[in-house]
Amino acid sequence: MATAPRLADWAPDSWQRHPTLQQPVYKDADALGRAVRSLAKLPPIVVSWEIDELRGRLAAAQQGRAFLLHGGDCAESLDDCESDRIVRQLKVLLQMSLVLVHGLRQPIIRIGRMAGQYAKPRSSDVETRDGVTLPAYRGDNVNRAPFDARSREPDPELLLRGYERAALTLNFVRALIDGGFADLHHPEYWDLDFMRHSPKYEEYRAVVAALSDSLHFFESLAGKPVHDSHRVDFYASHEGLHLLYEQAQTRYIRRQERWYNLSTHLPWIGVRTAALDGGHVEYFRGIANPIAVKVGPSADADYLRELVRVLDPDREPGRLTLIHRFGAAGIERGLPRLIEAVQGTGHPVLWVCDPMHGNTESTPSGHKTRRFDSILAELETAFAVHRAYGSRLGGVHLELTGDNVTECTGGARGLSDGDLARAYRSTVDPRLNFEQALEVAMRIARLQGGR
């Protein structure tokens, strides 16, 4: 695929000349410098040809020939980098993609919010409890969640620990996939132990049986195995928030004559850091990766037109994904102006719905949660609005886990506020559990099946 030449007015550190939000303040500048220099010497976590391959797949999704499934933890934990948990996360994403393949009848692009999702933006730099004020928890590659002075102090060494865990995670995922874990002949490999008790299990098994029958039919017809049915492509993604970390993993690839962020395949910019004059937009405009930006109620038409111009000046297919997040109550009013603004520019973008962040609320018990009905309502409205405006919703962005947690209420099991304390494990935002995630995939398949 032809690529645009590198920018003459950009460098991996040019963002430092711009106002940059959500960056931790480190007491020991020398220790920070040592950590960043070490990161810059370490091998990349991903490689440029994987990134280029993903850009091509996202271009197909922009054209309506594929659908993006983008999901994983709100914030990964260094302590959760263990084989069983990674397997469960991969299983639920594979199960969802199987349902979507069956329902949508098109390729599914599988991207995990994993192998690097260790930094989180916060609404305040500090947190106060019982009269004690400490730095806010910003994710495990910055500081630690326990509310004590030592844990909350930003530690440069955690940048290296985050890199190590990200590399271990993605290496394990690759080994599983290359070893046949994702073989379409054996979807039973993906079953979660506790899934058999789910109200949606039989519906899922029916999808598996239908796909298995189709696969065997085509193999019988062809007289040989279906090409590439023994593995799937899987990509990693995280919010490119901590720019010193991202800068350290940005490398110049001579054969492409471009700079790539080799810490992940698809980095994204969050709503809080997407200012046109900010450091994040400056950094992202210069890397060759496909990139995504979260947009919501605060984005107006003029801003969005300028954003797509700055981030994708060459109108490169597969380059730019826009992830909209409004909430069920606001999407019908807010989304049309964004669609019309982008349509007027002629830039190719992939529209993706994040039905999670706009639907977060707090219960009287103090738990943050999301109502499953609100999540589904935002998704359904997103599909309808895009159709009404001659656009296409090409993907979904979800915070989810393969664990049997109780963080979002509702779903087939009818979880209530009273269930939240039973298995609430997230340190930041509530996630869909395996059952709710699969139910979302089934709803998308029903909404879009046959279109």
State the predicted function of each range.
Residues 75-76, 80-327, 367-370, 378, ...:
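Active-site-facing alpha/beta catalytic cores
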Residues 115, 356-357:
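Short glycine-enriched loops at secondary-structure junctions
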Residues 1-143:
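Long, contiguous, compositionally biased segments that the model treats as domain-scale units
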Residues 319-350, 357-406:
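Non-transmembrane, aqueous-exposed alpha-helical and coiled segments at domain scale
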